[in-house]
Amino acid sequence: MIQISSETQLFIREHSSDNVRALALQAKKYPDIDMPTAITQIAGRQVAAEKIPSWREMEEIWYPKHLSLEQCSSEITARYKARLSQGDSLTDLTGGFGIDCSFLATGFKSATYVERQEELCEIAAHNFPILHLNHINVRNEDGVAYLQTMSPVDCIFLDPARRNEHGGKTVAISDCEPNVAELEALLLSKANRVMIKLSPMLDLSLALKELKHTQEIHILSVNNECKELLILLGQTSPAEIAIHCVNLLTKGTQEEQHLVFTREQEQRSQCTYTDSLGNYLYEPNASLLKAGAFRSIAAAYPVRKLHPNSHLYTSDSFIENFPGRIFRIVNQCSFNKKEVKENLADLKKANVTVRNFPTTVAELRKRLHLTEGGDTYLFASTLNNGQKVIIRCEKV
């Protein structure tokens, strides 16, 4: 049973921004403080300040040990998931720290949190009332065992553990625990809607092959870093499955980039390739690159693709709402030594990206005598006619 004394609680408040490693070395200075608990809570608060900002000022919230917190969702992705399903009843079969459950539960009249680790259940049972989530029932059980006997609900959520027995990260559905492919029929006998959070490294084709009742796919990125692959199962699967490519933004005025396509649309879409560059260069966000929506981008926006294997686009006029990074082209040159010297000799620092080019970023940076960073962006790529180009840009 977790208990935190008033002295330890005060210590946590007073040292909430301290370096936890330094504090651990000073444990003998504070004999009346439960230092392991204090360290866990202080570290948790510091991570939560970034991952779960709305909990930042809630001093009563308890946090788990680092591994569980490392694996949990961020608030921004949990809020997105909450938009995808509402109803009367929800069951989260892999409760964990409870972030996903706490945000998903706001759209349901009742919810059940299932977790086999007793300590995480204690933490969840303590935290949910503080978050005004008194309608969540906490069950300290194995999720698969609970699934066998549970009453039907509107929605089931699972976040299978993506670590193998040696502690390494895994990406195949069959290597996750529980194996949702084996449980698909049972899950859909208990709920009309099943939401599964998987590794963004999972191959989409493999996921669609293994999960026969997929209705939607959502690929979530945060600030252009791919974070989650969400698969929504239902009683029937449409002929063409919608793939939502979402980039959630915490900086700037734009909050979200969102493009929806199907694999069949991708095959049907027309794409214009180019031998020359316009005034602007576009790099699709991480979700679009993961999904392989290369033709669909060209169909949705008035852009030209540099080459079938160069996943960069160009246009003469500025396209403000393009779902990715936008750059103004300053100049371009071939990989010829003379041209490189004429166009790039003044550069000491630049952000270098390689797309469909015969050298690596490290090799190119070394050849150009550049350090990483600054306001200049260099894209080394290939045009449709096979010409190798280095494109010098500024971010819009």
What is the predicted role of each segment?
Residues 1-396:
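SAM-dependent transferase fold signal centered on methyltransferase-like domains
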